[in-house]
């Protein structure tokens, strides 16, 4: 209830440009969500299976494609990337209705490729951390996932630097506006990905995630599959299309 309440508050306050209230509401929503998932999800069971009658035993903990949590992440991100594709469609829609798109002389969009490279490295490190965890290489897990979080933040900053350093003003033309929307969407998802990475580090340190009980890092890796696709599409459209057109 509180997660929904404060998440709704974030969007409502932002609609009216009440930025401080929106930020506070968003932070509270994130805190409530983290508390909920920390205390109520992926709990390590006392035993691996439970007898349900008629000689049938069912596992009490599952990770991967057979788990409800994995499918919840998959369905959520499928809907999420559908919304993202609609934004990409908006970019090309504006191209079809403007004689000159992007406008000339072109201001921006800046250099986006370093950000994409950094975020793909972070993606690889996240997948590697899942492997290290399952292999029992605890130190390697901590190192790879910590580096993934750091590189992710660097990649997000690199993406933002493109339109920021070239002075793209979203109020002057639809082109800089859609560039900022696509960039902001991607960076917001990177920030969520970093929160997930840090969450997995905390779960492993607290003993709530182990070699066998690894639903957290498995689900986060799935999220990063979709995020990597989002990054490639964003950079391909923003940085690649102007040069092609």
Residue ranges of model-derived segments:
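...captures the hydrophobic TM-helix bundle architecture rather than a specific catalytic motif
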Residues: 1-245
């Amino acid at each position: 209830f509180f997660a929904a309440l404060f998440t709704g508050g974030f969007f409502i306050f932002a609609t009216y440009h009440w930025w401080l209230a929106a930020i506070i509401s968003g932070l509270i929503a994130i805190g409530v969500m983290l508390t909920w998932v920390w205390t109520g999800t992926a709990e390590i069971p006392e035993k691996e299976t439970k007898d349900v009658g008629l000689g049938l035993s069912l596992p009490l903990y599952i990770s991967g494609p057979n788990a409800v949590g994995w499918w919840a992440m998959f369905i959520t991100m499928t809907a999420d990337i559908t919304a993202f594709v609609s934004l990409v469609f908006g970019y090309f829609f504006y191209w079809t209705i403007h004689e000159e798109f992007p406008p000339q002389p072109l201001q921006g969009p800046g250099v986006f490729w370093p950000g994409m490279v950094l975020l793909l490295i972070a993606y690889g490190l996240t997948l590697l951390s899942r492997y290290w965890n399952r292999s029992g290489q605890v130190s390697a897990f901590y190192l790879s996932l910590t580096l993934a979080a750091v590189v992710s933040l660097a990649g997000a900053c690199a993406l933002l630097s493109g339109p920021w350093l070239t002075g793209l003003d979203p109020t002057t033309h639809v082109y800089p506006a859609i560039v900022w929307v696509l960039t902001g969407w991607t960076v917001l998802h990177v920030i969520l990905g970093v929160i997930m990475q840090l969450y997995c580090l905390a779960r492993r340190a607290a003993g709530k995630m182990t070699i066998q009980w690894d639903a957290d890092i498995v689900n986060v890796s799935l999220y990063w599959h979709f995020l990597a696709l989002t990054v490639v599409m964003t950079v391909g459209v923003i940085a690649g299309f102007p040069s092609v057109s």
